[in-house]
Amino acid sequence: MSVEVGSKSLSPWAPEFRHISFRGSIARDRFVYGHEPWEGNERGKVTLSEDEESFLRFLFKEAGLDLYRYRLKTIKRRIGACLRTLHANSFADARRVVQQKPALLPAAISTMVIGVTSFFRDGPVFEMLRNEVIPTLFKGRYGLAIWCAGCSDGPELYSLAMMLAEMKLLHRCHLLGTDCRWDAVRRARAGQFDAAAIKSVPAELLARYFTQQETHWRVKSVIRDAIHWRRADVLTLHEPGIWDLILCRNMTMYLTPEASAALFPRLEMSLRSAGALVLGKAERPLAACHLSTVGPCMYRRDR
């Protein structure tokens, strides 16, 4: 990606973006937590049969994911949908289908690891981003690095990109959306949504930044081309980089307490000093993290 400033073309890694660093790494042993299957009380409330657990371990391993980082209750109730997606009558059949047709793995994983999002979700959050957070982050800087972790099929990051375009700041930002599901990243990159999905987009933004295509609406290239999309798991991404703003909303509701406890330090360490983190309404960073509340769902790194 490059941006135009007058007659000058800038890469996100041009000198004007020199405060954005992707060097170094976050050592895995700083975020070690238990890998015993579903520690704590959850195992006592919900159980898996040996066949269920064996298949799920296989499926998640094939996708490069750790089954035991996800809440068992959520995983168990999605098993039937996964088998139906693979047109399998048994776990042995399902395993064989994935082995013989690896192209079906993304669809199978998408039935197990779900993501719910929408355009301009939680209006006050976007109001604060526009009126306070973004202007503050831009003080003394040419550009910002913004990461949406667990981006699903993209509505939240597209919302932010449209807001930045309205502020005449989009060309000065490097935006990245990541999700552990291939299908979600593919849909996000396509930027195509049905009528139900775009109901929360203000009419003037819909007219300015979308093109209607029969029964669907597609985000215009001026917005699509400003965003990079990547398939990655935030829990294992080894070098997330240093970001000015991170959005990671409602992810912990799908994770075990141990995985959630590992997630918040990773997010904190991925923020620059005074960088901003946006979480879901019911999420709170660990007390040990150096993150202070600055507004609804909004936190700032203090060191």
Residue spans of the language-model regions?
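Residue-level signal for inorganic ion chemistry
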Residues: 129, 246, 271
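Conserved SAM-binding loop of SAM-dependent methyltransferases across substrates and taxa
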Residues: 153-168
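Conserved beta-strand signature within the Rossmann-like core of class I S-adenosyl-L-methionine
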Residues: 274-281
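A short glycine-rich, Lys/Arg-flanked "PGG" loop and its adjoining helix->strand segment in the class I
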Residues: 261-273
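Conserved AdoMet
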Residues: 20, 24, 29-147, 280
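Core SAM-dependent methyltransferase catalytic element
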Residues: 286-303
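Extended basic-aromatic, gly/pro-enriched interface segments that bind polyanionic ligands
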Residues: 171-247, 251-259, 284-286, 290
